[in-house]
């Protein structure tokens, strides 16, 4: 990951952005356009996350990305930002996804105090579909077997399911919650074995839920960890409701704590 990319994604290097750059955020549905507006929005996220740490770098043929981790209010929150450059080498598009949903809810409250428009979850009229030109879809890479001690860092759960016997049923339930998926890009993880997949999933109500799934591999080549980030806010909220209906008898209440679930998100 270049220092310039990190600075641009933090809202600190607006000259690295194209004049017509556009940004998709984890919380809002429509894209934000224009260098000044995008740089300001990125700066608001940087401030709300309280100086997040870049923990993982991703690299693909036409897109690169960074995973950021932070603990605003003592709640570990992660976002992944993907950037594409134009022919002049300036950043043309940025897409940001977040996890986990209960802690993104708390982050949304913080952002709303600074810029209410950045926290507006409205999907508009009709099913949500991403803005922009239709991408060139690619094949989903083969996924190795899950390790016995695999951990799932879910986009919707407060806690992390661990172990093949638990993670397997969660992934099976997720597969029942969408009707189709298409792959936008596949990226390598810099410095460690694994890969990331950028996906559009067609979920209940005809909405598109956008995801980044990061698979890290252990020494045996098995999947040791899966990190899943999603956007936009309301589509993920609806997906969470579908998953709760399927898994409420499998996963205990500690997994579901958060807004509009059985228990409120605890105050740190």
Protein language model annotation of sequence segments:
Residues 1-268:
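C-terminal and inter-domain tail/linker signature
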């Amino acid at each position: 990951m270049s220092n310039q990319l990190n600075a641009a994604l933090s809202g600190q290097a607006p000259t690295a952005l194209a004049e017509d750059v556009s940004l998709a955020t984890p919380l809002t549905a429509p894209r934000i356009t224009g260098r000044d507006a995008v740089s300001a929005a990125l700066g608001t996220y940087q401030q709300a996350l309280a100086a997040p740490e870049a923990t993982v770098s991703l690299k693909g043929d036409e897109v690169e990305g960074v995973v950021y981790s932070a603990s605003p209010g003592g709640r570990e929150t992660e976002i992944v930002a993907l950037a594409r450059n134009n022919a002049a080498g300036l950043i043309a598009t940025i897409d940001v996804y977040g996890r986990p949903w209960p802690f993104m809810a708390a982050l949304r409250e913080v952002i709303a105090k600074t810029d209410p428009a950045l926290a507006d979850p409205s999907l508009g009229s009709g099913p949500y579909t991403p803005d922009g030109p239709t991408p060139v879809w690619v094949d989903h890479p083969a996924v190795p077997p899950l390790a016995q001690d695999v951990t799932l860092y879910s986009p919707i759960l407060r806690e992390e399911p661990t172990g093949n016997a638990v993670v397997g049923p969660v992934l099976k339930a997720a597969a029942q919650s969408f009707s189709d998926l298409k792959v936008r890009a596949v990226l390598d993880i810099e410095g460690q074995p694994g890969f990331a997949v950028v996906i559009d999933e067609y979920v209940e109500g005809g909405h598109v839920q956008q995801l980044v799934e990061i698979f890290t591999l252990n020494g045996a080549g098995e999947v040791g960890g899966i990190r899943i980030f999603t956007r936009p806010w309301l589509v993920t909220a609806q997906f969470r409701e579908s998953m709760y209906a399927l898994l409420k008898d499998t996963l205990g209440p500690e997994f579901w704590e958060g807004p509009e679930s059985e228990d409120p998100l605890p105050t740190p």
